[in-house]
Amino acid sequence: MALRLDGKALAKAVESRLQAQIESNLPQAGRPPGLAVLRVGDDPASAVYVANKEKACARIGVASYGAHLPSSTPFAEVLSTIQQLNADPRVDGILLQLPLPEGLDEGPLLMAIDPEKDADGLHTLNLGRLLKGEQGPRSCTPAGVMAMLRSQGIDPAGQRAVVIGRSILVGQPMALMLQAANATVTVVHSRTKDLVAHTREADIVVVAAGRPGMVGAEHIKPGAAVVDVGIHRKPEGGLCGDVRAAEVEPIAAALSPVPGGVGPMTVTMLLVNTVVAWCRRHGVDHDLADLLS
């Protein structure tokens, strides 16, 4: 039976560290960290995600500055809102909640966010910093995956790792982080021939394909660590991931559940990026570097 990579429990432990960091540095900083979440439109899933982030902020003492614009908002107004948040001295982290309504190009809007306030780690400058091994905000989901592996003593160094999916949101930064941890990394995707031949050789498999139940027992070698980034609503109710967990659990050494795996750590890493940015702005020390390496 696979070890459970419990993202919910780890997120709670990291939140405790963040809360202690805030309490320690608040007298010198003079104000709490601030996270602004910009939501455009009325996507129901986005509303739930934003509410979860606001609750997480409240738990650890981060001030939350939400902004909600109607779906009819023109590009120029969304851009202006981002620029206002860039200039707001209370705000240390900015998140543009995706997806955006049809007709709004997310690329230029993400690039308009001040790289030092880029709570999601998606700005081109911060992806470049990741590539070069420099300090900066890290992409939240991949950073959360790395923290989950480390928390269970799973060291990628010298291991074969396969990342399924090549999105800029997860797949590509995930591959860079695993490489930085000295894994030998292969990225596979929808055009890859003989997917099983690649995944069956892997010691670590990160599945971020966005396809429900894509990965089963035939893809995984015995003893591998499997991280399921996918989350989908099943027609009959409930949630599932990209991995057929019932098949994989008996043969994997470790498996992240859905829900309760990567999702909670994605939110927590958003807070880590925000708190670290706050510390840097005020010239105070922090002990969170292990979460961003």
From Swiss-Prot:
Protein's UniProt keywords contain Cytoplasm: no
EC number, UniProt record: 1.5.1.5, 3.5.4.9
Cysteines paired by S-S bonds: none
InterPro entries the UniProt entry points to: Aminoacid_DH-like_N_sf, NAD(P)-bd_dom_sf, THF_DH/CycHdrlase, THF_DH/CycHdrlase_cat_dom, THF_DH/CycHdrlase_CS, THF_DH/CycHdrlase_NAD-bd_dom
Top-level division of the source organism's lineage: Bacteria
Entry similarity comment: Belongs to the tetrahydrofolate dehydrogenase/cyclohydrolase family.
Pathway where it operates: One-carbon metabolism; tetrahydrofolate interconversion
Assigned keywords, A-Z: Amino-acid biosynthesis, Histidine biosynthesis, Hydrolase, Methionine biosynthesis, Multifunctional enzyme, NADP, One-carbon metabolism, Oxidoreductase, Purine biosynthesis
Record CDD domains: NAD_bind_m-THF_DH_Cyclohyd
Organism: Synechococcus sp. (strain CC9902)
Protein name: Bifunctional protein FolD
Binding residues annotated for NADP(+), in chain numbering: G165, R166, S167, S190, I231
Reactions catalysed, as given in the entry: (6R)-5,10-methylene-5,6,7,8-tetrahydrofolate + NADP(+) = (6R)-5,10-methenyltetrahydrofolate + NADPH; (6R)-5,10-methenyltetrahydrofolate + H2O = (6R)-10-formyltetrahydrofolate + H(+)
